[in-house]
Amino acid sequence: MLIADDLEKLLEILPHFVREPLKQHSNRKNLIEVVMDLGRRPEARFPGNPEYLSQRSISWQDLDYCVKKVGNFSGDNRAGIEKTLHRISSMRNREGSIIGLTCRVGRAVFGTISIIRDLLEQGDSILLLGKPGVGKTTAVREIARVLSDEMEKRVVIIDTSNEIAGDGDIPHPAIGRARRMQVAQPDLQHQVMIEAVENHMPEVIIIDEIGTELEALAARTIAERGVQLVGTAHGNYLESLIKNPTLADLIGGIQYVTLGDDEAKRRGTQKSILERKAAPAFQIAIEIHDRKAWIVHEKVEETIDQILQGHQPFVQKRQIQDNGRILIKCYPSQSTEVLSTNSSSLQKMSSLKQKTHFLQQREVKNKTFDLNKLENRDTSLLSTTINTPVNINNHSFQVEASIQYLYAYSLSWQHITSVISALDLPIILTKEIEKSDAILALRSQVKQNTKLRQIAKSRQIIIYTIQNSTVPQITRALRKILNINTSSDLNWVKLCKSKKFYEIQALQEAKLAIEIIILNENSIVQLTPRSAYIRKMQHNLIDNYQLRARSFGEEPYRKLRIYPE
């Protein structure tokens, strides 16, 4: 990477007792900013730790000396040094007098976005997320140069604080052929964004620091006009935008949706859920946690949907190694590789997983097929399994063996106790709904009892319903609560041993269909056409799960259809 920082021009505006120690400092190439507060010693901040530069305190005269050497401060208390990328920010007292300065070093780092160059070539809108000082503006500046010079696109930069292209009327060469639009007042940024589209015919618009609801709305308007957007926002994780009502529109917005009784039961969720409101303004989101390691969400739409449903999406970690090579890895968000940078998300997802007891996601060829997303009650499955390597692993579906506390409402305790004893299930009945992990009730009683539904909703407890208080229905419900049917007693490795590839593929297809039926009690799943010998193998597997199957159609298109119990 080539770095240009014009550090000497920044040092020229500093008082001599601040400038001289920095000139002689061995680590000045890594200087982040210089902080000068009235009545305090000057401080230099480096990536490792801050250091005091002098024993002398900053006076009014020292601050006035610096202010006179920089441009005028704008409405957001920012100024700059002409033809440089440095930013000078001021702190004022109640009378409006400057009592502190933050002199931040601006650097043009050429080659820093090689890690995401393939994403730029796709033409999708990109949102960069990260805490202050992590390098978002530096990355945006280099993106502007690459898009305008190397990809020859018409690029317009909305430079509200003159931080991307520097202070003055002539933009810094680091942005290449990109054009820069300055903003007279920071609160008018959204108007300048719309003006850029209407007047200057850009192919790409670059915005730094989207922070208000009007700016988020303007970004959405620009995206709907077919212009590629590259923007930055403060926030460590993509989940931060979901919780931020001001910026939620950037990822499509979040809304409460009330489901019908049947739909809520089929999904295994409460009736009131969160869903994405519209298509996101940015198709790609990048979390910058470190200057050399970025986490990429290539499909924001799918990632947001998975997060709202309580699933753990796959994340893509891109890292620049010491030899300059780029290492790209894909992990579930629960991976230890991203644990240090996504701990808050992990805690939220793990708690959801413990409460809902959903099936674990199944990984096939580095992709995750979420069985809860297959909503059609009569569907063909092989579109997800044809020409896909089969993962033969007897631990691919695990049953949670922890003890579950069950609250039974309007049901016979004697019947439930007899089923638990006969099957030796890890379930304890409780009379306190607050301590329960699940609720089992008659369907007719649940519809009439709004208080029960409210308590379950507030405590995030799933209500399992049955039609009648019979032993078979209670048995099926208890098995569903424990996900017992998701793991057969069959030894999967032994079953597939000495089988040919197409035979294993057919068994894998049947197994996936069985799990869909277990999740959606009323589902009917149709398999793809197979020979009589293969259909017999599938029949034997289905019988082991105590489900019904029937062949229909004419040869050679005869196939199985699997029914619930």
Curated annotation (Swiss-Prot):
Keywords: ATP-binding, Chloroplast, Nucleotide-binding, Plastid
Xref: SMART domains: AAA (SM00382), R3H (SM00393)
Residues annotated as binding ATP: G130, K131, P132, G133, V134, G135, K136, T137
Localisation: Plastid, Chloroplast
Classification via PROSITE patterns: R3H (PS51061)
Gene Ontology CC terms: chloroplast
Origin superkingdom: Eukaryota
CDD domains reported for this sequence: AAA, R3H_AAA
Location of the R3H domain: 503-565
Stretches that traverse the bilayer: none
Nucleotidyltransferase listed as a keyword: no
GO molecular function, one term: ATP hydrolysis activity
UniProt record similarity statement: Belongs to the ycf45 family.
Identification of the protein by name: Uncharacterized protein ycf45
Gene: ycf45
